[in-house]
Structures are given as C-alpha cells and as structure tokens.
C-alpha cells in the first residue's frame, strides 16, 4: 500500500492469463462455450448505509461513531482481496484499504466485507482495533496499542481460508511519520505485519464460517532507525494440512537489498514461526506470491533483480525470482532469478521518472495524469490437476505497450517455458494481473485499456494526446484448461469502463488506484474483485488544464475538505472510489 510495487498472487491461486480481443465471445478450445461474467455488485456501500462491527458479525451489539460515519462519507477503497470458503462456496470474504475511517480516525484501515450469497450482497465491517474501537475484539488486539501510539493506518490486505471454516486476514499497519507507541520518536514508519483469524460463529453451520473474529498475531515489527519497512504481504492457507504460509517484503530504501521474509503457522494461525529470509542472492525484491503444490510443496515467486549490493545498481536486470520448499515451508532452497523481463511501469509515461502524475505540484512534463502501476509481478499459481506452476507478469513491449506474459513449469520450478503473451491485443495496456487455480482451471484477471479510443503505446491508459483522461479501463478474465500452456479467449468482467485517473489523493491533486485486484476460486465457483470509479463525481477543472480528472470538492473550486486524510465530512462523491465484484461462470 505504501511503497513502490504491485502485490502478489495467492495461495490456492494460479495463473494470470488472457487470450483474445476486446469483447471476444469465441468458444474455447474443444468447443466449450467461453466463460461469462455476472452482474457487477458494489461491495463497499458507503452512502446511506452503515458498517457493522466485528462484534455484530458474531451476534453481538457493539457499534460506534466510526462505523456510522463509514456508511455515509463516500470515501475511497482500493487494493481489494477476495477469498471463497472451501466448505461453503456461497460464503465470500473480501478486504481493502478502506478510507472510510479518515473522518473519525485520520487514516485508512483494513476493511472486512462478508457475503453469504456468493457475492450477490455484502455486509461491510472493519478489522478490529481501528482508532476509536472500544469493543472487546478491538481492545484485545495487539494492534490497539500501536494505534494508540500513532500507527493508525493499515493496508495491503490479503485473505485465505483453511478447510475448517477459518479465514486468515493478513496486512500491515503503520503511520505516516508520527510516533508509533514504541519508539517515542517521529518518522517511524512502523510497517508491522500481522495475521488476523476469523472462525465460524456456529461450527455446525458452515454459513457462519469466518464470521467470528478470534485474534490477531504480529509476525514482524519494524525497528526504528534501521531504514526498514515491512510491506507487500501475501498469505496462503493449505486446506489439506491447516498450515498457513505468509510472506512479505522488507524494504531498505536505497541502502541495500530489499528482502523477502517468510513465516508459517502449523496450528491454524494461533502462532507463527520467526521470520526467515528466503531471498538471499537476489536484490530489488518485492511482492511475494505463494502457491502450494499437490504434496504440500511451498513455492514463492517475486519481482527481483541482479542489482548486486544495491537494488539500484547500474545494469541491474529485472525478472521473476523463485524459491521452493519440500518440507511444508520449514526450509527453502536457494533463490534464483528464474527469468528476466522488462517490467511495464507507470514511470515510462511521466517524462521525469515519476510513478504518478496529477495537478500541480504533482504535474509531469508529459502533461499526462495517471496513478502508479509499477508492481509488475510475477504472480504465481499451482495447477495441481495438471502438475504445473504458472507465473504471470506485466511486460513492456518494444513499442512501450504493456502486456501480460506467462510461463509454466512442469518440474516444480526447476525450469520454465519461454514467456508468451497471455491475451495478445493490438491496442491498449494490460496491468495488475492476478491468478488462482481450482479444479484443473487456472483463472486470471487484470486491468485492460484495449477499449481506449485515444490509445497510444507512449501514453498512459485513458489519456489522450492533449492530456485529457477518460473512462476506458475494464477488468478482463481468461482461463487455462491445460495448466497454463494455452489460454482461452478473454472476456470483459466490468459492465462499464472506469477512469482510473481521478485525482482523489494528495489534496485531490493526484490519483491512486491501488496496486492490485484479485480473482478467487473454489471448485467451479469463481469471483473477481476490483477497484472501480464509476460512482466518483467529477468536477470542472478550474486550473485550466482540462484533464478530466478533477473531482467534486476540489479546493480549486471551493472545496473545504481538501485532503484525503483530513478529518472532515465530505459527501460530495468526489472521493467515492469503491470495490466491486462479479461472479464468473466457467
């Protein structure tokens, strides 16, 4: 959520692919009909509604002013995660960076959303221990003390289920330069990594799976003054063994190689092992993605480089790093750079290397407006029916066009196929892939701008030659029935395109669209979840640049709730960024 990079693929997850053209409806190989997407459903209803507490989810009665305000303030949500209960496929859980807590708590906090209707309807909640949470669940969480000290922000959510009705929710909490309750000094960006566990309220009723908050465990704490920040989390639970595997990035700025750390639980999330470094020999490490093989093998892939002592060393080559464990995550082999590629990143469109561009003081030489999208992958999935591992990543073609490429391995990651385009498209950019696998099917989703009427390989998604933005971005889905070796045609998941370039952050002067979206699957039940701007209320641009990205409430037009992190009521809809979901029929 806080640093440069995308996020990671998940556990019972697999490949990210897309074949076909915009709006393709051709049948897949073998004559089967293509998959189809269901209705787009708004997950985060923060207008004329209310959030419920973890206590209420489990049958209690606690509520507070934070939850009430969350239902009316029309704030941002991004970086969604999604997981489907293997015991009851109608039970879906989702999470996101939820800024509904800003008016009362001053910063974003992990949202917790639950559906018992297969994603057709949702109940919105928050992870316990947000600032102002006086419930028994909140005060008992180890995050409460950190929040009391100033680490009031949380994000980078990822979720996974075991086979006993337990849901595991991983993320990090931090501050933006305030005391954290431990160091007693400023500019301690914490980066504490945690895993929360939700169990069934009634073990005999699987529809209550994951509805009762149980506890939160801290996996790693940042140490002030060492230039370290824990971020970019990933989590996978193994339904067969009950083990829970977690990995994350430990960023060191420009002073040394970032690290990938790993921890596991062998008691259904009650405790976790001390973190171990699994990225030795690789630099520039970020965004781990975990997959579990048919016999419990644990594989981890991430974006790395050959940068030597420094991630920014001259001549560093980017690529997909990989390592695996044959003893359920107890020990790992030596990490290697499995393949190299040129990542597709937002910085190529700014003209000065900036990862995102907006209105002054965030304007860029090219005059374009766009959020960062520089976490290139890889995203890893295991198709245990076909015995393959699949990786996918966003690559810059020689023209500058962003496309998703994938590779597969039939020998547990010892060797990989040559990279191939997942969803070849003549126009448009593709970014933020996510993978999952189930029932011998590898599913992939990603953002796609192939419907952009102003597309040029040298321009950011949804930007015209004159710097005007538009709603051109969609979510697309594709699947592979042979372990990632080939892919069927892609379909459009979203029923309306969105403008990812709305300037809702930095005092309503710069966009942020999160670092990932998610696809989840159990059996033949598949769901996608993404960040969506269809409810955002735009505004005329008083500065005269006419970028089409200004939003209602902009201070240039007299707005007084000027900052994304100002504790004021807005309600204009200018900040109304939401999470949407859709069921996929294979």
Which residues make up each language-model segment?
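C-terminal PAP-associated
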Residues: 30-586
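Secretory targeting and sorting signals
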Residues: 2-29
């Amino acid at each position: 959520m806080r640093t440069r990079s995308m996020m990671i693929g998940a556990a019972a997850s697999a490949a990210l692919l897309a074949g076909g053209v915009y709006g393709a409806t051709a049948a897949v190989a073998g004559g089967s009909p293509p998959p189809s997407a269901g209705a787009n459903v708004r997950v985060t209803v923060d207008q004329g509604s209310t959030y419920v507490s973890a206590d209420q989810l489990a049958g209690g009665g606690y509520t507070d002013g934070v939850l009430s305000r969350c239902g009316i303030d029309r704030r941002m949500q991004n970086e969604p995660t999604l997981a489907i209960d293997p015991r009851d496929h109608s039970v879906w859980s989702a999470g996101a960076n939820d800024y509904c807590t800003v008016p009362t708590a001053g910063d974003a906090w992990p949202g917790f959303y639950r559906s018992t209707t297969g994603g057709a309807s949702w109940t919105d909640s928050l992870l316990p221990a947000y600032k102002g949470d006086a419930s028994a669940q909140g005060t008992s969480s180890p995050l409460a003390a950190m929040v009391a000290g100033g680490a009031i922000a949380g994000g980078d959510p990822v979720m996974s289920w075991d086979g006993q009705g337990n849901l595991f929710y991983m993320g990090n909490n931090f501050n933006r330069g305030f005391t954290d309750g431990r160091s007693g000094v400023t500019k301690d960006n914490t980066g504490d990594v945690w895993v929360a566990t939700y169990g069934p309220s009634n073990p005999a009723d699987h529809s209550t799976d994951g509805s009762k908050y149980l506890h939160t465990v801290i996996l790693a704490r940042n140490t002030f003054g060492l230039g370290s920040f824990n971020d970019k989390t990933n989590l996978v639970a193994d339904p067969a063994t009950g083990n829970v595997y977690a990995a994350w990035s430990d960023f060191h700025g420009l002073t040394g190689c970032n690290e990938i750390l790993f921890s596991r639980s062998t008691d259904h999330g009650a405790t976790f092992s001390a973190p171990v470094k699994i990225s030795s020999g690789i630099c520039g490490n970020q965004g781990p993605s975990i997959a579990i093989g048919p016999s419990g093998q644990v594989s981890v892939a991430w974006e790395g480089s050959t940068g030597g002592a420094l991630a920014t060393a001259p001549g560093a080559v980017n690529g997909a790093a990989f390592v695996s464990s044959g003893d359920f995550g107890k020990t790992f082999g030596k990490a290697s750079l499995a393949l190299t590629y040129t990542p597709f990143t937002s910085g190529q469109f700014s003209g000065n290397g900036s990862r995102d561009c907006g209105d002054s003081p965030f304007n860029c030489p090219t005059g374009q407006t766009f959020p960062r999208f520089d976490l290139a992958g890889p995203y890893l999935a295991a198709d245990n029916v076909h015995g393959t591992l699949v990786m996918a990543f966003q690559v810059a073609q020689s023209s500058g066009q962003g496309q998703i490429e994938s590779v597969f391995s039939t020998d547990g990651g010892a060797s990989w196929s040559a990279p191939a385009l997942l969803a070849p498209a003549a126009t448009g950019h593709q970014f933020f892939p996510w993978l999952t696998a189930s029932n011998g099917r590898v599913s992939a989703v990603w953002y796609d701008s192939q419907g952009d009427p102003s597309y040029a390989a040298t321009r950011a998604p949804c930007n015209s030659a004159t710097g005007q933005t538009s709603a051109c971005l969609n979510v697309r889905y594709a699947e592979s029935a042979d372990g990632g070796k080939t892919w069927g045609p892609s379909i459009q998941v979203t029923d309306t395109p969105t403008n990812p370039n709305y300037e809702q952050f930095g005092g309503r002067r710069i966009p942020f669209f999160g670092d990932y979206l998610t696809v989840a699957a159990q059996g033949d039940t598949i769901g996608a979840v993404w960040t969506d701007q269809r409810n955002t209320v735009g505004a005329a641009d008083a500065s005269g640049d006419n970028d089409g990205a200004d939003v209602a409430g902009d201070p240039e037009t007299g707005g007084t709730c000027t900052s994304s992190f100002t504790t004021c009521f807005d309600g204009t809809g200018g900040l109304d960024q939401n999470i949407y979901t859709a069921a996929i029929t294979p």
